[in-house]
Amino acid sequence: MSESLRIIFAGTPDFAARHLDALLSSGHNVVGVFTQPDRPAGRGKKLMPSPIKVLAEEKGLPVFQPVSLRPQENQQLVADLQADVMVVVAYGLILPKAVLEMPRLGCINVHGSLLPRWRGAAPIQRSLWAGDAETGVTIMQMDVGLDTGDMLYKLSCPITAEDTSGTLYDKLAELGPQGLITTLKQLADGTAKPEVQDETLVTYAEKLSKEEARIDWSLSAAQLERCIRAFNPWPMSWLEIEGQPVKVWKASVIDTATNAAPGTILEANKQGIQVATGDGILNLLSLQPAGKKAMSAQDLLNSRREWFVPGNRLV
């Protein structure tokens, strides 16, 4: 193996834990782990540790959980570890300039897109939402901007017509550790080749909201089908029927022109619930009424056919 780097790892969710696990499995020297404070979760609102904390404690690594890295005493926690590099994966806290400059080789980040496309909070979802043909991971040198640092390594993968944000998340959670380990080797060997991002190609991946996930029937069927996959498993595309939210898990596009107003139910049968859109027909295949499990359109029609009378409009 190349020169053994002293690594600080900073991350919080399962996506980050897969990267830390890969580093440890490949023999890297992780000298400390930073993760967000325990948060209330579940019905009992019991304080729960992050997946990163669970893994780090399992492996006997020192864990630090500052609320912020702005206070001097918290920055000193980083300095005292005398790291060569800090690896940041979905940490959730801003790293001040002073922290970015502490490790000898700086701080590097694993980002879930092919930068400079989809800088920001929701790159996986936005790549699906926009109909991109491929996505991937970028390992970049961090600076004070939002995903603006020089790119060190990229790995790409195709986006299929069946991918959801959930399946794409899993694909990138496999690619990310591969790219990270390669990048660390290059940093240790002095062979890394930073590449400046082309500002003319930048797009921003804004955070998702539950309101954005409400189905807008004026959009095209193709756009709506992509939204349904992009917002799965969160926040989930939804429509409202009789004041109740109904989540949509799966749909398909029927490329047939219709003069019906967007939102008009055209057919409701065992093939699905066909609804007119701004362009084309969206066929709803799997839905989930409030308080119920997801079910096929046919199963929902068996219990709630009055919701989907042809000619009625969904709003």
From Swiss-Prot:
GO cellular component terms, A-Z: cytosol
Amino-acid positions noted as binding (6S)-5,6,7,8-tetrahydrofolate in the UniProt annotation, renumbered to this chain: 113-116
GO molecular function terms noted in the UniProt entry: methionyl-tRNA formyltransferase activity
Any Pfam family the entry gives: Formyl_trans_C
Keyword Plastid among record annotations: no
EC numbers: 2.1.2.9
Enzyme category, top tier: transferase
Catalytic activity of the protein: L-methionyl-tRNA(fMet) + (6R)-10-formyltetrahydrofolate = N-formyl-L-methionyl-tRNA(fMet) + (6S)-5,6,7,8-tetrahydrofolate + H(+)
Gene3D superfamilies: Formyl transferase, C-terminal domain, Formyl transferase, N-terminal domain
Entry keywords, A to Z: Protein biosynthesis, Transferase
InterPro entries on file: Fmt, Formyl_trans_C, Formyl_trans_C_sf, Formyl_transf_N, Formyl_transf_N_sf, Formyl_transferase-like_C_sf, GART_AS, Met-tRNA-FMT_C
Entry superkingdom: Bacteria
UniProt family annotation: Belongs to the Fmt family.
Function: Attaches a formyl group to the free amino group of methionyl-tRNA(fMet). The formyl group appears to play a dual role in the initiator identity of N-formylmethionyl-tRNA by promoting its recognition by IF2 and preventing the misappropriation of this tRNA by the elongation apparatus.
The protein, known as: Methionyl-tRNA formyltransferase
Organism: Escherichia coli O139:H28 (strain E24377A / ETEC)
High-level lineage: Bacteria, Pseudomonadati, Pseudomonadota, Gammaproteobacteria, Enterobacterales
